[in-house]
UniProtKB/Swiss-Prot annotation:
UniProt EC number: 2.7.1.40
Tissue spec: Mostly expressed in seeds, and, to a lower extent, in roots, leaves (veins and trichomes), inflorescences, siliques, pollen (grains and tubes) and flowers (sepals and petals).
Physiological role: Required for plastidial pyruvate kinase activity. Involved in seed oil accumulation, embryo development and seed storage compounds mobilization upon germination.
Identification of the protein by name: Plastidial pyruvate kinase 2
Record field: catalytic activity: pyruvate + ATP = phosphoenolpyruvate + ADP + H(+)
Record's keyword annotation contains Transmembrane: no
Stretches the record annotates as Disordered: 6-26
GO cellular component: chloroplast; chloroplast stroma; mitochondrion
Species for this entry: Arabidopsis thaliana
Uppermost EC category: transferase
Example of a GO biological process term: seed development
Transit peptide extent on chain: 1-63
Pathway: Carbohydrate degradation; glycolysis; pyruvate from D-glyceraldehyde 3-phosphate: step 5/5
C-alpha cells in the first residue's frame, strides 16, 4: 500500500510564517559566503566597523536567497534582518579551522563528492585522517603503482578510520592498471629536443640516450608511419617515421624530459590489448579478498568486458560496483551499452584527450555526464583537475573553473590523482576542491532533473516516490531522510537531485560505504528496530545530536525501494515531520 503522510498540510507548510523552512533555505544559501565574510569581518572587528565590501557579500547572498524563495509568501519574521545575518556569518567557522568532530557539517553542506588517490604523499594514518577532514569521500588506489602490500596497508587504514568515526565514512575504490603501453626503466631521465631522432623497441631492458624499450610486444604492429605517438597524454610527442620488425623510429615533435615507465598513446588508435589483463585479474582478486567498494576498470572498449567482470564477482560472492573508465577511442561508439552494463562511469580525460582530438574532450565530458544521469548511473570527472597543485600551493584560475564546470554539469564526484598521490600539497588540493564545489553548488537552481531518468529504472513505484519526495524537498526546502538496506532508493533520490541533503540510514556497513560516492547523499549507519516509528524517532534524534538538523526544522521521510524494511506496515511511505 502506498502512503503519503504530512504532519500538517503541505499548503500550510508553504504559507506559515513560523514554518522555518524559508529561513533554513536562506541560511543554506548564505553559508558559502562564510569564507569571504569571515576574513573581511575579522578586519572589520579590528577596525571597529563593518567594511563596505563585506556588506556587498551579504547583500548578494540575500538577493540569491530571495530569488530562490520567491515562490513562497513569507512574513518579515521568516527572514532575519541584515545585522542578524552578518552576525551569524561572522560566527560561522571556515572549514579547516575545526577539529575532526566537526567534519560532518561540511559533509552535509557539500553534495559533490571528492575522490582522492592515495599514494606516497598520503599513505600514512595521519594523512588519511587529515584527507578525510579536508573532504575526501572515496579513497582510490591506483594499481598502476605500488604493490599489494602497500595497497593493503591503505585499505586497512581506511577501514580503521571508518570503524572509529561515527559521523563519516570513506569508500574504497580500486583502479585497475588496464592494458597500458609504457616505456621501460631508465637509469636517469633523457632530455629530448624537437627534431631529434629517437627509437622505441620491443626488446626488453634497452635504455640508451637514443632508444628505450616498451612493455607491449605488438607495439610495432599497432603503429604506422605518420602516426603521432604521445607520452603522458601529450606532455611529449613523436612522429613515427619508419619501423622494423622490433623497433619504431620516430622524430621528436614536442621535446622534454623522458622518464621511466611513461604512458604511451597513439593518437586516434587503441592498443589491441584485452581490457582486463592478467595483472588486472590478480588485482581484482585482491580487491575481492579485501572487500573494496568499487572497481574502476581502465580502457573499457565494450560492454562484454563489464559483463565478464560482473559474472566473476557474482561467482565470487562479492558485492562490488563496477565503474567504467571512458578513456579509449574504441569506447565512444559503444558508450551507451558500456554505461548500461556498469554501475557508473569515470570521464578519464587524460588518455581520452590523447587518443582523440583534445578539443573533443569537454564536449564528450558533458555528453557522458548527461548520459549517466539519464540512466541513473554515478559519474566521476577525473584527470588534471588541479594538476598545478602537485608542485604549487594554489591552483590556476582555469583549474578552479574546471571543477566548477564539472559540478554544474552534474557530476556525482570529482577526482584528484597525482595531486594527492605524490603532490606537495595534498591537503590544500582537497580543500580547494571542497571549497569550489561548495560555492558552485550554492548557485545551482534546484529541481533540474535529467531527461528520461524514469526510463532507466524498472521499479516504477519507487521512481514515483523518489520523484514526489524530491518535489516535496524542493517545495518545502527540506532535507530528506531515507531508510534503505540495499541503497537503491538513496541512489534513485540522488539522481533526482533534491535541493536538500539526502540522509541515508542503513543497517548495512557495506551500503553505507557505497553511498559515499553519490551526489547529495550523507550515509549513516544505524541498527533498525522492528518498529518503524521507533526507527524514525531514533534517526531524527541522531541528526539532531550531530547538528545536521535543527529543532523545528521540517524533514521529508521516505521508506521505499526494492526490499521494503517494514513490509507489514507499509511498502511505500513519505512523511513530512517537524524535528
Amino acid at each position: 500500500m502506498a502512503q503519503v503522510v504530512a504532519t500538517r498540510s503541505i499548503q500550510g507548510s508553504m504559507l506559515s510564517p513560523n514554518g522555518g523552512s524559508v529561513s533554513t533555505r536562506s541560511e543554506k544559501l548564505l553559508k558559502p559566503a562564510s569564507f569571504a565574510v569571515k576574513v573581511l569581518g575579522n578586519e572589520a572587528k579590528r577596525s571597529g566597523r563593518v567594511s563596505v565590501r563585506s556588506r556587498r557579500v551579504v547583500d548578494t547572498t540575500v538577493r540569491s536567497a530571495r530569488v530562490e524563495t520567491e515562490v513562497i509568501p513569507v512574513s518579515p519574521e521568516d527572514v532575519p534582518n541584515r545585522e542578524e545575518q552578518l552576525e551569524r556569518l561572522l560566527e560561522m567557522q571556515q572549514f579547516g579551522d575545526t577539529s575532526v568532530g566537526m567534519w560532518s557539517k561540511p559533509t552535509v553542506r557539500r553534495k559533490t563528492k571528492i575522490v582522492c588517490t592515495v599514494g606516497p604523499s598520503t599513505n600514512t594514518r595521519e594523512m588519511i585522517w587529515k584527507l578525510a577532514e579536508a573532504g575526501m569521500n572515496v579513497a582510490r588506489m591506483n594499481m598502476s603503482h605500488g604493490d599489494h602490500a602497500s595497497h593493503k596497508k591503505v585499505i586497512d587504514l581506511v577501514k580503521e578510520y571508518n570503524a572509529q568515526t561515527k559521523d563519516n565514512t570513506i569508500a574504497i575504490m580500486l583502479d585497475t592498471k588496464g592494458p597500458e603501453v609504457r616505456s621501460g626503466d631508465l637509469p636517469q631521465p633523457i632530455m629530448l629536443d624537437p627534431g631529434q631522432e629517437f627509437t622505441f623497441t620491443i626488446e626488453r631492458g634497452v635504455s640508451t640516450p637514443s632508444c628505450v624499450s616498451v612493455n607491449y610486444d605488438d607495439f610495432v604492429n599497432d603503429v604506422e608511419a605518420g602516426d603521432m605517438l604521445l607520452v603522458d597524454g601529450g606532455m611529449m610527442s613523436f612522429m613515427v617515421k619508419s619501423k622494423t620488425k622490433d623497433s619504431v623510429k620516430c622524430e621528436v615533435v614536442d621535446g622534454g624530459e623522458l622518464k621511466s615507465r611513461r604512458h604511451l598513446n597513439v593518437r586516434g588508435k587503441s592498443a589491441t590489448l584485452p581490457s582486463i589483463t592478467e595483472k588486472d585479474w590478480e588485482d581484482i582478486k585482491f580487491g575481492v579478498e579485501n572487500k573494496v567498494d568499487f572497481y574502476a576498470v581502465s580502457f573499457v572498449k565494450d560492454a562484454q568486458v563489464v559483463h565478464e567482470l560482473k559474472k566473476y564477482l557474482q561467482n565470487s560472492g562479492a558485492d562490488i560496483h563496477v565503474i567504467v573508465k571512458i578513456e579509449s577511442a574504441d569506447s565512444i561508439p559503444n558508450l551507451h551499452s558500456i554505461i548500461t552494463a556498469s554501475d557508473g562511469a569515470m570521464v578519464a580525460r587524460g588518455d581520452l584527450g590523447a587518443e582523440l582530438p583534445i578539443e573533443e574532450v569537454p564536449i564528450l565530458q558533458e555528453e557522458i555526464i548527461n548520459l549517466c544521469r539519464s540512466m541513473g548511473k554515478a559519474v566521476i570527472v577525473a584527470t588534471n583537475m588541479l594538476e598545478s597543485m602537485i608542485v604549487h600551493p594554489t591552483p590556476t584560475r582555469a583549474e578552479v573553473s574546471d571543477i566548477a564546470i564539472a559540478v554544474r554539469e552534474g557530476a556525482d564526484a570529482v577526482m584528484l590523482s597525482g595531486e594527492t598521490a605524490h603532490g606537495k600539497f595534498p591537503l590544500k588540493a582537497a580543500g580547494v576542491m571542497h571549497t569550489v564545489a561548495l560555492r558552485t553548488e550554492a548557485t545551482i537552481t534546484s529541481g533540474e532533473m535529467p531527461p528520461n531518468l524514469g526510463q532507466a529504472f524498472k521499479n516504477h513505484m519507487s521512481e514515483m516516490f523518489a520523484y514526489h519526495a524530491t518535489m516535496m524537498s524542493n517545495t518545502l526546502g527540506t532535507s530528506t531522510v531515507v531508510f534503505t538496506r540495499t541503497g537503491f532508493m538513496a541512489i534513485l533520490l540522488s539522481h533526482y537531485r533534491p535541493s536538500g541533503t539526502i540522509y541515508a540510514f542503513t543497517n548495512e556497513k557495506k551500503i553505507q560505504q557505497r553511498l559515499a560516492l553519490y551526489q547529495g547523499v550523507c550515509p549513516i549507519y544505524m541498527e533498525f528496530t522492528d518498529d518503524a516509528e521507533e526507527t524514525f524517532a531514533n534517526a531524527l534524534a541522531t541528526l539532531l545530536k550531530q547538528g545536521m538538523v535543527k529543532k523545528g526544522e521540517e524533514i521529508a521521510i521516505v521508506q521505499s525501494g526494492t526490499q521494503p524494511i517494514w513490509r507489514s506496515q507499509s511498502t511505500h511511505n513519505i512523511q513530512v515531520r517537524k524535528v
